[in-house]
Swiss-Prot record:
Protein name, as recorded: Signal recognition particle subunit SRP68
Quaternary structure and interacting proteins, as annotated: Heterodimer with SRP72. SRP68-SRP72 heterodimer formation is stabilized by the presence of 7SL RNA. Component of a fungal signal recognition particle (SRP) complex that consists of a 7SL RNA molecule (scR1) and at least six protein subunits: SRP72, SRP68, SRP54, SEC65, SRP21 and SRP14.
Segments for region (Disordered): 553-578
Domain of life, per lineage: Eukaryota
Gene3D superfamilies: Signal recognition particle, SRP68 subunit, RNA-binding domain
Family to which the UniProt record says this protein belongs: Belongs to the SRP68 family.
Subcellular location: Cytoplasm; Nucleus, Nucleolus; Endoplasmic reticulum
Major subcellular location class: cytoplasm
Length: 587
């Protein structure tokens, strides 16, 4: 906006565009007064009522554009005065009169929109009126009114920005609109409201403040009631978000500094000091009793908000010449980031505990899914630990840096242990044994006092926890060794061939084994086996064992046959006598 409207010509062109749009809008609403004689009595714009707006919101748009046209005219004159002082007093009077006309249209707009149901739209109308009122008060050097007007404007703009910033899961087109609104609000705040508010504070003797934080000042003076017609907007905001307009009680003793390790830094922002007090008060946050990761989201968002506040404060004071203040702000930045990252660590560790408890009584496949998520979370935790080590000032603190190194080793070891248990669930016991043995060897050489510092924020780890984990490792290694040995023995049996002919130590004991005497699927070469016949082989072909008959039957038949043959031979005188094998003794 500031880049688009930078010269008197720019303001003049924009004013002409608005005049054309206003003329068209007045025709649409039938607000044209052709007879200009005695115009004040005949003109219709001043007679617009809330009922007209309730029927058609274009009546409100007409008044808003009318106020903007007069405001542009005053800015055009101001730009001319910056170039030349010719007729300065008359131009100045004209400029103030145009601001007054703009304010009059703004007040009329507030009157007719009293029944507007959209409270955010009403807040925008009041914000615009507060900006015009503040501009008029500054030009008339009415500093108390200027302080009240710009305080109201700043509270309203901060509220609108927070509402836009909280929008989530929006479509791409809405996201572009939201981003534009946030950019516009930021530019108005930085280029108009903050400089004007700072000027009003410096000029108003009654506006003594112990802080240079404009947000805190605006909350202190937004209820001054110097401009009663603007006060309803504070009540509207308070109904939606009371904290947006709540004042830090004067009875509350704010902390003046923060301590990070051996460094102490002064706080120059009351809002920052107040919110740090709330977040670091263990009795108020009660984080020690948190047993759910979602409960830590409040702390996480709190530290993130502090980081945003302090970053904006540093951006506004980036040209600070006071080296002590620059150093204090750098220490506070490290302090906030340090606690923010440890809050994230604690939240992730609680999620791991929840996943571990859920995976205790489930099947192996489901437990593997839980372990996969746990390993991923440990990867995030290790990355966060590395971010903490990279913070300014950490490397120079030997005890802290060494403790963070060991903290990273501890998380790596716990991640490896989960990985080893996952291998064991997959029956990969040798791999699990290797991992457990590696973890045991890595941590066995550690000192008795693993962490050199007394404690970490939110107690993310301790020497007692490490010693307990270290003592459990040998039993886990032994268990992995036993399972790995069983796995090796089992694999030996499983690797033996099913075919009897290929395994001399395997004997056929079932039909299944008998079916696998040999593997004929292999490429075989069949060849005759050389053999030498013996006398028994020849004689075997002539031996008759009775074809399976009983021995008594064979003996009786043999005796009967012998008797019959001898009788026949005796009765046959003509039978020839033969020798051995019919060769010798023939007659």
């Amino acid at each position: 906006m500031s880049a688009y409207l930078s010269s008197s010509e720019d303001y003049h062109k924009q004013r002409k565009r608005l005049n054309k749009r206003l003329l068209k809008l007045r025709h649409e609403l039938d607000l044209i007064t052709p007879d200009t004689k005695d115009y004040k009595k005949k003109e219709k714009i001043s007679k617009i009522s809330s009922s007209d707006y309730d029927q058609d919101e274009k009546y409100g748009l007409l008044l808003l554009l009318t106020a903007e046209r007069d405001s542009l005219y005053s800015s055009e004159i101001k730009s001319l005065l910056e170039i030349s002082n010719d007729n300065a007093s008359s131009y100045r009077n004209l400029m103030i009169s145009r601001i007054k006309k703009s304010l009059s249209s703004s007040k009329k707009l507030l009157e007719i929109t009293v029944n507007e149901k959209d409270e955010y739209k009403r807040i925008e109308y009041y914000t615009y009126a507060a900006l015009i009122q503040g501009n008029l008060s500054v030009n008339k050097k009415q500093w108390s009114k200027a302080l009240n007007a710009f305080s109201i404007a700043k509270c309203a703009l901060d509220f609108l920005y927070s509402q836009e910033d909280s929008k989530m899961d929006i479509e791409e087109e809405q996201e572009e609109s939201t981003q534009f609104k946030k950019t516009l609000i930021s530019e108005i705040t930085e280029t108009l409201v903050d400089p004007s508010l700072a000027l009003a504070i410096s000029q108003d003797d009654t506006a003594y403040s112990t802080t240079t934080d404009l947000k805190t000042v605006s909350r202190q003076h937004c209820r001054d009631n110097k401009l009663s017609y603007l006060q309803p907007v504070i009540e509207i905001i308070a109904r939606i978000d009371p904290e947006a307009v709540s004042e830090v009680s004067s009875s509350t003793e704010l902390i003046k500094s923060v301590q990070w390790r051996d460094h102490e830094a002064t706080l120059y922002n009351d809002e920052l000091a107040y919110k740090i007090m709330k977040l670091t008060n263990d009795n108020e946050t009660n984080w020690k009793n948190f047993n759910d990761a979602n409960q830590f989201d409040v702390l996480l968002s709190g530290w993130s908000e502090l980081l945003e506040i302090h970053t904006n404060d540093m951006d506004k004071n980036k040209d600070e010449d006071d080296l002590e203040k620059v150093q204090d702000r750098a220490i506070v930045l490290t302090y906030i980031n340090f606690n923010l990252l440890f809050t994230r660590l604690k939240r992730d560790l609680l999620i791991i505990d929840q996943l571990s408890s859920q995976g205790d009584n489930v099947f192996a496949l489901k437990k593997l899914e839980f372990n996969k998520d746990i390993i991923r979370l440990y990867g995030t935790i290790i990355t966060t630990t590395q971010e903490i080590k990279d913070l300014p000032g950490v490397y120079n603190d030997e005890d802290l840096h060494e403790s963070l190194d060991n903290l990273e080793k501890f998380f790596v070891a716990k991640k490896s242990a989960v990985l080893a248990r996952s291998f064991a669930l997959n029956n990969k016991f040798p791999e699990a044994l290797k991992i457990f043995d590696h973890v045991d060897n890595t941590l066995s050489s550690s000192d008795n006092k693993f962490y050199k510092i007394d404690e970490f924020p939110y107690n993310v780890s301790s020497n007692v926890e490490f010693e307990k984990f270290k003592k459990e490792l040998p039993s886990q290694v032994l268990q992995a060794q036993i399972l790995a040995q069983f796995s090796v023995d089992l694999s030996k049996n499983l690797n033996q061939s099913n075919f009897v002919i290929e395994n001399m130590n395997k004997y056929p004991v079932s039909n299944e084994t008998l079916d696998n005497i040999a593997n004929f699927n292999k490429n075989l070469s069949i060849a005759p086996v050389l053999s030498k016949p013996v006398l028994f082989d020849i004689g075997f072909n002539y031996i008759n064992y009775g074809m399976g008959r009983s021995s008594s039957y064979n003996n009786s038949n043999s005796a009967t046959s012998t008797t019959s043959d001898s009788t026949t031979d005796q009765n046959d005188p003509n039978k020839k006598k033969s020798g051995f094998f019919g060769i010798f003794g023939r007659s």
